[in-house]
């Protein structure tokens, strides 16, 4: 057997971004980022983490929000100081 046969074929990677949301028609997506973060945690609080439509909000905030913001918001939620009701 050759060395190439021993290696697995590379996995196909598909790149996707968030679709259009009529609530946020402008190019500045900061509000869309923040609202998707809030919507995700409200959704899993109401329906549970296994509820598939909640994943749409997760993908939105993971795609739009800088990770530093998400880390800070996670910390604020844990401390009870998050600036919006969830």
Curated annotation (Swiss-Prot):
Give the bilayer topology.
Peripheral membrane protein
Q: Name one GO biological process term.
A: proton transmembrane transport
Task: List each copy of the CHCH domain by range.
Answer: 30-73
**What's the main place this protein lives?**
mitochondrion
Give the InterPro entries listed for this entry: COX6B-like, CX6/COA6-like_sf, Cyt_c_oxidase_su6B
Where is the protein situated, by its record's location annotation? Mitochondrion inner membrane
- S-S bridge residues: 33-65, 43-54
A GO CC term attached to the entry: mitochondrial inner membrane
| Pathway assignment | Energy metabolism; oxidative phosphorylation
Location of the motif Cx10C motif? 54-65
Q: Mind listing the UniProt keywords for this protein, alphabetically?
A: Disulfide bond, Membrane, Mitochondrion, Mitochondrion inner membrane
Motif, Cx9C motif: chain positions:
33-43
A Pfam family assignment: COX6B
Q: Which PANTHER family match?
A: CYTOCHROME C OXIDASE SUBUNIT 12, MITOCHONDRIAL (PTHR46281:SF8), CYTOCHROME C OXIDASE SUBUNIT 6B (PTHR46281)
Q: How does it assemble?
A: Component of the cytochrome c oxidase (complex IV, CIV), a multisubunit enzyme composed of a catalytic core of 3 subunits and several supernumerary subunits. The complex exists as a monomer or a dimer and forms supercomplexes (SCs) in the inner mitochondrial membrane with ubiquinol-cytochrome c oxidoreductase (cytochrome b-c1 complex, complex III, CIII).
User: What family classification does the UniProt entry report for this protein?
Assistant: Belongs to the cytochrome c oxidase subunit 6B family.
Its biological purpose is as follows: Component of the cytochrome c oxidase, the last enzyme in the mitochondrial electron transport chain which drives oxidative phosphorylation. The respiratory chain contains 3 multisubunit complexes succinate dehydrogenase (complex II, CII), ubiquinol-cytochrome c oxidoreductase (cytochrome b-c1 complex, complex III, CIII) and cytochrome c oxidase (complex IV, CIV), that cooperate to transfer electrons derived from NADH and succinate to molecular oxygen, creating an electrochemical gradient over the inner membrane that drives transmembrane transport and the ATP synthase.
Give the protein name, as stated in the record: Cytochrome c oxidase subunit 12, mitochondrial
Gene name of this polypeptide: cox12
